[in-house]
Amino acid sequence: MAKDMTLLWGSGSPPCWRVMIVLEEKNLQAYNSKLLSFEKGEHKSAEVMSMNPRGQLPSFKHGSKVLNESYAACMYLESQFKSQGNKLIPDCPAEQAMMYQRMFEGLTLAQKMADVIYYSWKVPEAERHDSAVKRNKENLSTELKLWEEYLQKTSGSFVAGKSFSLADVSVFPGVAYLFRFGLTEERYPQLTAYYNSLKERPSIKASWPPTWLESPQGQDMLKDV
């Protein structure tokens, strides 16, 4: 079963991490795992391009089926192995609706986070503007306050109800990334409590980015958000 699965991934990538968390939650740890280096450009290798012509990670293969979008891979795994491991989509219609809502809202959070963190990496120096940096940080702050409210309503343990779900699989890696880049704990107490609670979950600990373990000290880019 898991031996028919291959995951090409990069350390610290939230999309890669999502798939790894689901594989852990569904007791599919025997999959073929291949860690590639973004720094060395290995995500553009022939092996990756043959599975994902976009040259992006993750790239997940189960038998002859290839899924290169992390949300798609996560939903596929839960669908195919519904009765194995931990259930990640609740049966209750109201909880399921909330799970899907928060899951896909996580994409907005990820985009606003990327607008800040990757701005200086993606925008040529001659085209950068302080006003854009300020605006992006303000947009991220507004988004984070929304998630603070969400977590307050759910008592902070999970983003979409009483149990760990695909919504948490989708959102947690991004939250961890935010704190890795210096998000202030005092300013976002609900997100801090959520992060500190879920980082101890076995599936998350088992898939923690190895580069983060090697270099626990992150950056302070988000200290003023």
Swiss-Prot record:
Where in this chain does the entry annotate a coiled-coil region? Answer: none
Subcellular localization(s) per the UniProt record: Cytoplasm
InterPro entries per the record?
Glutathione-S-Trfase_C-like, Glutathione-S-Trfase_C_sf, Glutathione_S-Trfase, Glutathione_S-Trfase_N, GST_C, Thioredoxin-like_sf
One GO term under biological process is: glutathione metabolic process
Q: Which Pfam families match?
A: GST_C_3, GST_N_2
**Quaternary organization:** Homodimer.
Q: What is this protein called?
A: Glutathione S-transferase A
